[in-house]
């Protein structure tokens, strides 16, 4: 009797985890309606400079770019994910200047973006108090630079 009860409890738990993961995927913003040229202008005028400042003292060949994107909405999805979702070894880049400017550009030039991000922002309020730039964060920002370069290529498909 015990193995069946345990099996039932585990199946219910895994079902709940699966549903939570599915909800997370559904809540991802769709960047297809963004004004890509305005976002590109914001990147070229300010965000790129802040990324370079963050990476100052780091050799560009130090990290391999493993994250890629196929079109502009996909690039923005990857940029948003790397910038605002904490990863192992890099708690969060969300308070960095380039991240704040990225968020502002997306909120201004992507209809409805700021409303969909309210819950995600509230969930990330627990942050480290002291600022530590780890090697993992530098690698992540290097990935962001590559994604932004890909986003800005003139022949990249819009969708």
Swiss-Prot record:
Report disulfide bridges, numbered on this chain: 34-110, 69-75, 90-137
Source taxon at top rank:
Eukaryota
* Glycosylation, residue list: 64, 119
What is this protein identified as? Thymic stromal lymphopoietin
Record organism: Homo sapiens (Human)
Localization terms from the record: Secreted
- Give the GO terms filed under biological process for this record: antimicrobial humoral immune response mediated by antimicrobial peptide; cell surface receptor signaling pathway via JAK-STAT; cytokine-mediated signaling pathway; defense response to fungus; defense response to Gram-negative bacterium; interleukin-7-mediated signaling pathway; negative regulation of apoptotic process; positive regulation of cell population proliferation
Q: Which UniProt keywords apply?
A: Cytokine, Disulfide bond, Glycoprotein, Secreted, Signal
